Amino acid sequence: MRRSVYLDNTIEFLRGRVYLGAYDYTPEDTDELVFFTVEDAIFYNSFHLDFGPMNIGHLYRFAVIFHEILNDPENANKAVVFYSSASTRQRANAACMLCCYMILVQAWTPHQVLQPLAQVDPPFMPFRDAGYSNADFEITIQDVVYGVWRAKEKGLIDLHSFNLESYEKYEHVEFGDFNVLTPDFIAFASPQEDHPKGYLATKSSHLNQPFKSVLNFFANNNVQLVVRLNSHLYNKKHFEDIGIQHLDLIFEDGTCPDLSIVKNFVGAAETIIKRGGKIAVHCKAGLGRTGCLIGAHLIYTYGFTANECIGFLRFIRPGMVVGPQQHWLYLHQNDFREWKYTTRISLKPSEAIGGLYPLISLEEYRLQKKKLKDDKRVAQNNIEGELRDLTMTPPSNGHGALSARNSSQPSTANNGSNSFKSSAVPQTSPGQPRKGQNGSNTIEDINNNRNPTSHANRKVVIESNNSDDESMQDTNGTSNHYPKVSRKKNDISSASSSRMEDNEPSATNINNAADDTILRQLLPKNRRVTSGRRTTSAAGGIRKISGSIKK
């Protein structure tokens, strides 16, 4: 087990192995200690009075140097002291960089890396913004550490896939001055066109090198939306020509956006993210206004605090979120987090944001959802109505022989015949197959009843074969009007006990024939159509017979 090393102005991170120091002199290595610093190799490029924190590229370079020292066989049993000068700014940068290293590389938790820094005297200096006004808002090492840790937990930072060469190349102005903040967002300074004639160029061949670099990178990295927050310094057609949608959400430099702009931005960004694309956002410098909107989305999506969000953004792109925008983000951080649960992405696109979908309240979302359901129901009903109109059958022309009677008794017409009327068959039947005597099959024509035949020319054959079913065939086969027959009770009784002779139909058989034709029409074709009374067959089943009881 390694033993502790006690040195003045030194903080122990890992017992006997990793220490943080601050000295006004250059310490010399011993048999037990190895000292190193990066102040002469890694520099923070300040905008004004800002001095840190160091960015992710600085951390990557620091990690490479640190690992070389730790893995040197000569240092296997020595404690390694990472130190800085005694300057308050340098102490803060060194401590913050070592803490972020332990979070990202060694997978320490925030409380593990912050515990050694607690109660340090003098305390570490907080970081300020890149603006020119007095620093009235500060973030601490703790804010940066928690911001980096949360980004790591949410999959926004991965040093294993980090490309140092690309990062350092594109952060330079001559290559576009942009940084990939997260897998979904790119922050960049506004491209500018050289237009000495007073108009914006429309051909990309006349663009300067930074603009061309931006266009090439965006086209090759699935950027689907560019959001402009400043006044026009280029023609948006350059982005649209390569298939990138362009959106203007302009507000004044150095000011804070209205919440309606934020909702439009968050909704538009969510729309693009769900499509699998990236969003590139810029203002004049790509720092203040850009940081406001991207920061609001990070808080909305991942639950950052305002300070954590600012710390993380500056860790990726130094200088982001300036002046009063820091206070604005702090004051509205709870609003942005609540939006995750109190708002929804609109179901209707907004022309104000180029046909994308803004963020709306739950109440408005419910109304939209209800209206869409109602509209869908109405449209479905209209379609069904149109289909019914197309497939509706014409009304009956009254000539069908198989139409049902208005009553159980035949009505007496002026011509003295019995007329049967029904709407059971909506259109004229083409004729039904019938079984005839001696196994012969015929087609009964039941359509032509315009010229009814006389009673003398009609012949109704009712036959009882060996089967239990009876068949009836109209040998003349056309008219559904029968002559009026006077009948008595005894006649009906006699007709029910004997077969009909001389082809003279009785009223009972006429009624049975009409019932039989109606049953034949209404019953499914695969059923056996029978008529007459019910009786028990030899097998014990019930059968209908025509006119008489089968013995």
From Swiss-Prot:
The record describes its quaternary structure and partners as: Component of the RENT (regulator of nucleolar silencing and telophase) complex which is composed of at least NET1, CDC14 and SIR2. Interacts with CDC5, CRM1, SIC1, TOF2 and UTP7.
Q: Name the gene behind this protein.
A: CDC14
A Pfam family found in this protein is DSPc
- Phosphoserine modification sites are S467
Q: What does this protein do?
A: Protein phosphatase which antagonizes mitotic cyclin-dependent kinase CDC28, the inactivation of which is essential for exit from mitosis. To access its substrates, is released from nucleolar sequestration during mitosis. Plays an essential in coordinating the nuclear division cycle with cytokinesis through the cytokinesis checkpoint. Involved in chromosome segregation, where it is required for meiosis I spindle dissambly as well as for establishing two consecutive chromosome segregation phases.
User: Principal localization?
Assistant: nucleus
- Organism, by scientific name, is Saccharomyces cerevisiae (strain ATCC 204508 / S288c)
pH dependence (UniProt free text)? Optimum pH is 6.9.
Gene Ontology, cellular component aspect:
cellular bud neck; cytoplasm; mitotic spindle; mitotic spindle pole body; new mitotic spindle pole body; nucleolus; nucleus; RENT complex
An example Gene Ontology biological process: positive regulation of autophagosome assembly
State the CDD domains in the record: CDC14_C, CDC14_N
This enzyme catalyses: O-phospho-L-tyrosyl-[protein] + H2O = L-tyrosyl-[protein] + phosphate
Spans annotated as Disordered: 384-551
- Does the record's keyword annotation contain Cell cycle? yes
Q: What else is known?
A: Present with 8550 molecules/cell in log phase SD medium.
What name goes with this protein?
Tyrosine-protein phosphatase CDC14
